[in-house]
């Protein structure tokens, strides 16, 4: 179902269901022979949610049957697992580097089923603010506490739609805009219209003093190319039809959740406002972590740029 300006969701619907897909991919990577990451909570989320489209990543028996239904389906599924594994490793390392540098305020925008508050070795005094839809945060906290898990930092949930006045809600929850903070917008930006993307980074910029850090993965050049979009849509249509047979469940058309609009380049926008910026493409990040993109699968993943930045003094 196409997005609307005031749509909402729980963990099994629309954008919320993508968080379960990410958790399933993290579970598959964690349980693999040579994992890049360790997320012991990912499997808990997937099991708690029950059967759905996310099952295809986390069930090894389904993966072995994939190519019987559609040639290259298993390769595409493995590519998605690799995508999420490298993305997770990138953000894990970003957060830990910021913590090592002494930053003790962490803001995770569109937190979804990100369990970093619960699994990363945060230094004493760290406060993590997680922002997302109320039902999503409730599912995560309730599920983890039912399994006896405890956050490894002071966790402050801020249940809010990011299209609302989240800076006000964040500060009312205790965020101190006079101190450095580390921000993440992981797996978020392509679900925002271009204007909302601009507003998101304007708000982050306004709340960031020197020493603050930011990481995000954003649409790269070519994201809106009509020929590439057509190839991606056709490729995903075939894979989605086959995957639906495997899990006996409807598979969300993720193309309907994204906004393929021309956007302000986030890296240059940040540089103009006093941030030191580093970037890596999806292919560069995959290579950095020893993963590869299968031949012919380039169009199955949207062009993605990983951005990390630090606010300069002065």
UniProtKB/Swiss-Prot annotation:
Top EC category: transferase
Keywords assigned: Methyltransferase, S-adenosyl-L-methionine, Transferase
Annotated GO biological process: methylation
InterPro entries given in the database record: Ppm1/Ppm2/Tcmp, SAM-dependent_MTases_sf, SAM_mthyl_Trfase_ML2640-like
Pfam family, one: LCM
One MF term in the entry's GO annotations: methyltransferase activity
Biological role stated in the UniProt entry: Exhibits S-adenosyl-L-methionine-dependent methyltransferase activity.
The protein's name in its UniProt record: Putative S-adenosyl-L-methionine-dependent methyltransferase MAV_0301
């Amino acid at each position: 179902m196409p997005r609307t300006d005031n749509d909402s969701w729980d963990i099994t619907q629309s954008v919320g269901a993508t968080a379960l897909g990410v958790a399933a991919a993290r579970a598959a990577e964690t349980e693999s022979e040579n994992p890049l990451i360790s997320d012991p909570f990912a499997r808990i989320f997937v099991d708690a949610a029950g059967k759905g489209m996310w099952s295809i990543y986390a069930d090894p028996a389904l993966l072995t049957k994939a190519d019987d239904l559609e040639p290259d389906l298993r390769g595409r599924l493995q590519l998605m697992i690799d995508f999420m594994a490298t993305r997770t490793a990138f953000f894990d390392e970003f957060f830990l580097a910021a913590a090592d540098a002494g930053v003790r305020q962490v803001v995770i925008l569109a937190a979804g089923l990100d369990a970093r508050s619960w699994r990363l070795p945060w230094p004493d005094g760290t406060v993590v603010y997680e922002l997302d839809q109320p039902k999503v945060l409730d599912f995560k906290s309730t599920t983890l506490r039912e399994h006896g898990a405890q956050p490894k930092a002071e966790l402050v949930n801020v249940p809010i739609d990011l299209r609302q006045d989240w800076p006000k809600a964040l500060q009312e929850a205790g965020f101190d805009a006079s101190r450095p903070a580390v921000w993440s917008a992981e797996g978020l930006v392509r679900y925002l219209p271009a204007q909302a993307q601009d507003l998101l980074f304007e708000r982050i910029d306004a709340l960031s003093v020197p020493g603050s850090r930011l990481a995000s993965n954003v649409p790269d050049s070519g994201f809106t190319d009509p020929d590439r979009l057509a190839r991606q849509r056709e490729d995903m249509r075939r894979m989605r039809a086959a995957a639906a047979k495997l899990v006996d469940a409807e598979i969300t058309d993720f193309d309907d959740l994204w906004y393929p609009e021309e956007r302000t380049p986030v890296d240059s926008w940040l540089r103009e406002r006093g941030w030191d910026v580093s970037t890596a493409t999806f292919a560069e990040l995959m290579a950095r972590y020893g993963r590869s993109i299968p031949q012919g699968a380039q169009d199955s993943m949207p062009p993605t740029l990983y951005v990390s930045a630090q606010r300069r003094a002065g």
